[in-house]
Swiss-Prot record:
Domain of life (superkingdom): Bacteria
Pfam families associated with the record: SelO
UniProt name for this protein: Protein nucleotidyltransferase YdiU
Signal peptide limits: none
Catalytic residues of the enzyme: 248
Binding positions (Mg(2+)): 249, 258
GO molecular function per UniProt: AMPylase activity; ATP binding; magnesium ion binding
Length: 480
């Protein structure tokens, strides 16, 4: 099969990029490929063959139709205007056109210096590349909108961070890499016509159903608000903390993008901060919904030259309701509740209060709860709590609520076990795979990827056990 690549961004937005080719790594070699995604995209096996070398995956070759470029954008970082940013180490190689009309960017991360590298070296390290590959595929398996990882190479190129690490590249695939920061860039340069040009481009290619609407810009922005609310509600439901929700890391399509110092909750701590560079806790787990709105407000400001302030504010006012509605439905699913009743929030808050007090594991708590039976006062979750009396009191109220549902255990458990994962990507699991990969053993990386692709199946291995003490103390930062 021949892959088809288009150049819409290059052809339609000439002021939004710089043309350049990747800078290959020393002795680059393919260490992982996403076989299911490759099949979905029609990528021939020959491109992954050992005799092909690193090829396109290592920036050593381009496929027919590719025309590489680095995109320019700006953004707010940790609440402050950061000015021009852009693809500092990533290069958009091309836009793959599928037969069904869908189009996917092929974006090579760690591809070398670009005009937007600022003080960086244009490289990515094996550690962060593995973390992104694992996280994006884990989130996809959980049903959360995300960029995807197609292939990964390591190399003999030394990259200097807190320590010397091997350089690596990741082929990231997404329907679009347009960020809030793309619009901010030209707004702050006082070029509103280019902001509108980009809006027209995005609507034309990603919201074509809106093109003939009189108020297409407002309808488009409202959908961005809804997508952002839905995605962040999903994060909160599975206990995912992004860690660096700058406006340049916010996808216009509502995708989870730019996996850096992320983390999944171990103990349930609403104020969990996964990024040790986030000294003020701006991007803590519990702050993510509010930050999402703040970022949307920055996007709204950039769109103000052609959408009225009144209309933008009305759309922004829909965010909280959309997020709370989505979150509430997902949490009722996690509790096995098929209907909505007035006391449901109190029931959930009561469980959360217990979990905070006992430092209960977020993922294990809900997974074990999904095995509980309505008619039994015993629950596999009970042994997780020291204060059994407090748990018994909460569980009695929960069982009473289940009796109102008139749904049998099998049906309820099936729903709960389909939304409460047995396995999430804990940082200690990623770290173990990284350490073995840095030593030349890719076996654990492959095993972990395979496990994360099936997160809702009960397991007996150590992927689902409580994290070791050292695993809870792991520090991750923006260094990658």
């Amino acid at each position: 099969m021949t892959l088809s690549f288009t150049t819409h961004w290059r052809d339609e937005l000439p002021d939004f990029y710089t043309s350049l080719s990747p800078t290959p790594l020393d002795n680059a070699r393919l260490i992982w490929r996403n076989a299911p995604l490759a099949q979905q995209l029609g990528v021939p096996d020959a491109l992954f063959a050992p005799e092909s070398g690193a090829g396109v995956w290592g920036g050593e070759a381009l496929l027919p139709g590719m025309s590489p470029l680095a995109q320019v954008y700006s953004g707010h970082q940790f609440g402050a205007w950061a000015g021009q940013l852009g693809d500092g180490r990533g290069i958009l190689l091309g836009e793959q056109q599928l037969a069904d009309g869908r189009r996917y960017d092929w974006h090579l991360k760690g591809a070398g210096l670009t005009p937007y590298s600022r003080m960086g070296d244009g490289r990515a390290v094996l550690r962060s590349t593995i973390r992104e590959s694992l996280a994006s595929e884990a989130m996809h398996a959980l049903g959360i909108p995300t960029t995807r990882a197609l292939a990964m190479v390591t190399s003999d190129t030394p990259v200097y961070r807190e320590r010397v690490e091997p350089g690596a590249m990741l082929m990231r695939v997404a329907e679009s890499h347009v960020r809030f920061g793309h619009f901010e860039h030209f707004y702050y340069r006082r070029e509103p016509q280019k902001v509108q040009q980009l809006a027209d481009y995005v609507i034309r290619h990603h919201w074509p159903q809106l093109q003939d609407e009189a108020d297409k810009y407002l309808l488009w922005f409202r959908d961005i608000v809804m997508r952002t609310a839905q995605t962040i509600a999903s994060w909160q439901t599975v206990g995912f903390a992004h860690g660096v929700m700058n406006t340049d890391n916010m996808s216009i399509l509502g995708l989870t993008i730019d996996y850096g110092p992320y983390g999944f909750l171990d103990d349930f701590q609403p104020d969990f901060i996964c990024n040790h560079s986030d000294y003020q806790g701006r991007y803590s787990f519990e702050n993510q919904p509010a930050v999402g709105l703040w970022n949307l407000q920055r996007l709204a400001q950039s769109l103000s030259p052609f959408i009225s302030a009144e209309a933008l504010n009305a759309a922004l006012d829909e965010y909280q309701h959309a997020l709370l509605t989505a979150y509430g439905q997902r949490m009722r699913d996690k509790l096995g509740l098929f209907s909505q009743q007035k006391g449901d929030n109190d029931l959930l808050d009561g469980l959360f209060a217990l979990m905070i007090r006992e430092k209960s594991d977020y993922t294990r708590t809900f997974r074990l709860l999904s095995h509980s039976e309505q008619l039994s006062a015993a629950s596999p979750l009970r042994d997780e709590f020291i204060d059994r009396a407090a748990f018994d009191s909460w569980f009695a109220g929960y069982r009473a609520r289940l009796r109102d549902e008139q749904v049998d255990d099998a049906q309820r458990q099936q729903r709960m076990q389909g939304v409460n994962p047995a396995l999430v990507l804990r940082n200690w699991l990623a770290q173990r795979a990284i350490e073995q990969a840095e030593a030349g053993d890719m076996g654990e990386l492959e095993r972990l990827h395979a496990a994360l692709a099936d997160p809702f199946t009960d397991r007996e291995d150590d992927y689902v056990r409580r994290p070791p003490d050292w695993g809870k103390r792991l520090e991750v930062s923006c260094s990658s």
